[in-house]
A protein has these predicted regions:
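Conserved short beta-strand edge segments in small beta-sheet-based binding/regulatory domains
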Residues: 148-152, 261-264
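In a subset of proteins, long, contiguous C-terminal domains/tails are tracked
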Residues: 421-467
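His/Glu-based metal-binding/catalytic segments typifying zinc-dependent metallopeptidases
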Residues: 1-77, 232, 249-324, 467
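Short linear interaction motifs
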Residues: 35, 211-219
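Surface-exposed flexible segments
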Residues: 65, 244-257, 357-359, 453-467
Length: 467
C-alpha cells in the first residue's frame, strides 16, 4: 500500500463512527453467603464445564511474607500432601480436571494507586460431573501440603531459578515496567515483589539453601496457614444452575479442613525501598528503556481519549521515532485509570535518544493534526480490542476485576463514549497530562553493560541483572 496515492487509499471502504456500538454490555453476578463465605455466581452457558475460582485476600500478611506467598504458588501441587505424593496429585489433576493454577495477583483501585486488593487466586476447571474430584484436590493441596521434603524443595527452587535465568532478558520489558512503576505506585510495588525482586529473593534462597532450608520450610507453612482461611475466601464459579449446585454441594471438600482465621481488610504492607532510576546491566546488546509517572498526582484525570492516544502513539510517534529512526523492535505505552502511566521501548539500540523522544512527546501532541479519515481509523483501531469475543472464564474474570477495582458499568460506558467521540482537540488537550508523566523524575533501564556504564551519569544506581 506504500506506493498508493492518498486518493487511491481514500477509496478503500471504512467503517464510520456511527457504525460502532455505543453501549457496553452489562456485567453482573449473583452474590450470596454459603456457610458464611461470599459466593459469587457468574451465569454463562459453559457447556457442562465448571470454572471455579477461589480468591484468598492477603491483608493478613506482613510485607516480609509476600515473597514467600509468591514462592508458595510455585510449590502448591508440586509437593506431597498428607494423602498423596506430588506425582499422584498431577495424575489426579490430569485425569479429572482441565488444569489448576495458583497465582498471587492484585486488583488495583480504579482511581487511587495506594489502594489495591491483593489475592492468592486458585483457579480450576473440570467437567461438572467431576467438580467434586476437582474440589477434593483443591482442598487437599490447600489444607494438607507438607513442606517437609528438603530435597524436593531444592529441586523446585532450582527449576524455578533456571526458568527465570532463561527468560530474564526476553521478558526485560515486563521487568523494567514493573520496577519503574514500583518507584511511584504502591499498587505496582506489591506486584513487583513477584517480578525482579522475586528473582533476587529466589537467588538468595538458593545461594544459602543449606543454612536456610529449615527456615524456608517453616515460613512456607506459616504463610500458607495465614492465607488459606475461610475468613479470607471469596468463591466464584462460572456456569449455570448445575455448575453452581455442584460447587455449593462440594464446598466442604475445600473448606472442611480449613481454619476460620481472622477477618482483615486493611492494607499495611511496607516494602523495602529499592532506590529509583536503576540501570540493570546485562550481557545483551540492546536496551529496554522505561519512563513514567502518575498523572492523577499532578491533578489530571483519566479519560477515554487516552486510549485513542495510545493507539496513535503506537502507530505514529513511537513507531517513527523509536522504531523507524531509532532502530528498536518497538515501543508502547501503559496507562491505567488510577493515573499510573509509562512509556517503554523494546530491544532498543539506544538509551538517551529514547529518553529524549519521550521528553518531546507532549510537543508532538500539542501540534497533532491529521485528516478526519485517519482520526476515525485510530478510533476504530482503539475499539477493536474491546470487541473481542470473551470466553466464559474471561467474562467471569472481568466481573471480578470490576468488583475488586470498584469499576462500575457507568465508568465503562463513559470511557467507551469518550473513545467513540474522541476528536483531534481531545488528543491535543492531553499534552499537559503527558508532560506531567515525562517530566516526573522516574525511569528504569535494562540493557548492555557497556552502554549503561557509558551513560552512567543518568542513573542513581547501576546493578548487575543476574544473580
Amino acid at each position: 500500500a506504500s506506493g498508493e496515492t492518498e486518493e487511491a487509499l481514500a477509496t478503500i471502504p471504512l467503517l464510520s463512527r456511527s457504525d460502532l456500538k455505543r453501549e457496553v454490555e452489562e456485567v453482573s453476578q449473583e452474590e450470596e453467603k454459603v456457610q458464611g463465605i461470599t459466593h459469587l455466581s457468574y451465569q454463562e452457558n459453559t457447556s457442562g464445564i465448571t470454572y471455579l475460582n477461589l480468591f484468598f485476600t492477603l491483608y493478613g500478611l506482613k510485607a516480609e511474607d509476600v515473597p514467600y506467598a509468591y514462592l508458595l504458588t510455585t510449590i502448591l501441587g508440586s509437593m506431597d500432601t498428607d494423602n498423596h505424593t506430588y506425582q499422584e496429585l498431577t495424575r489426579i489433576s490430569n485425569t479429572y480436571t482441565g488444569g489448576m493454577s495458583y497465582a498471587i495477583t492484585s486488583y488495583d483501585d480504579k482511581a487511587d494507586n495506594t489502594k489495591y486488593v491483593p489475592v492468592c487466586a486458585v483457579r480450576g476447571k473440570a467437567l461438572t460431573s467431576n467438580a467434586d474430584k476437582m474440589m477434593q484436590l483443591m482442598g487437599e493441596v490447600l489444607n494438607h501440603t507438607r513442606f517437609t521434603d528438603t530435597g524436593r524443595l531444592r529441586e523446585i527452587l532450582m527449576e524455578e531459578k533456571a526458568s527465570w535465568d532463561m527468560s530474564l532478558f526476553d521478558r526485560g520489558h515486563a521487568l523494567v515496567m514493573m520496577r519503574l512503576m514500583s518507584y511511584y505506585s504502591p499498587a505496582a510495588q506489591f506486584k513487583e515483589q513477584g517480578s525482579l525482586s522475586y528473582y533476587y529473593f529466589l537467588s538468595d534462597l538458593l545461594e544459602h539453601f543449606d543454612e536456610k532450608a529449615e527456615h524456608i520450610k517453616a515460613r512456607l507453612a506459616e504463610t500458607a496457614a495465614k492465607i488459606f482461611t475461610r475468613k479470607n475466601l471469596i468463591v466464584q464459579e462460572v456456569g449455570l444452575k448445575e455448575e453452581k449446585q455442584a460447587v455449593v454441594n462440594h464446598l466442604d471438600a475445600v473448606i472442611g479442613d480449613m481454619p476460620e482465621g481472622e477477618a482483615c481488610h486493611t492494607l499495611s504492607f511496607v516494602f523495602p525501598e529499592t532506590g529509583i532510576n536503576e540501570g540493570f546491566l546485562s550481557s545483551g546488546k540492546v536496551q529496554y528503556v522505561a519512563k513514567g509517572g502518575n498523572f492523577v498526582k499532578h491533578g489530571f484525570k483519566f479519560t477515554g481519549a487516552l486510549r485513542v492516544m495510545e493507539t496513535i502513539l503506537r502507530y505514529e510517534y513511537l513507531w517513527k521515532r523509536i522504531r523507524v529512526l531509532g532502530g528498536a523492535y518497538g515501543a508502547f505505552t501503559r496507562i491505567a485509570t488510577n493515573g499510573d502511566a509509562l512509556l517503554c521501548s523494546y530491544r532498543d539500540p539506544n538509551l538517551s535518544e529514547t529518553l529524549k523522544a519521550y521528553k518531546e512527546l507532549p510537543e508532538y501532541l500539542r501540534h497533532f493534526n491529521i485528516s478526519e479519515r485517519e482520526m476515525t481509523k485510530y478510533v476504530i483501531g482503539t475499539m477493536a480490542p474491546a470487541e473481542t469475543q470473551l470466553t466464559p472464564s474471561m467474562k467471569g474474570e472481568r466481573a471480578m476485576v470490576m468488583r475488586f477495582t470498584g469499576q462500575t458499568h457507568d465508568d465503562r460506558q463513559k470511557v467507551r463514549e469518550q473513545i467513540i467521540d474522541c476528536t483531534q482537540e481531545d488528543i491535543r488537550a492531553l499534552a499537559g497530562l503527558m508532560d506531567s508523566v515525562v517530566s516526573d523524575k522516574y525511569f528504569c533501564v535494562l540493557g548492555s553493560e557497556d552502554k549503561l556504564k557509558a551513560e552512567s551519569n543518568l542513573f542513581d544506581h547501576l546493578r548487575s541483572l543476574t544473580k
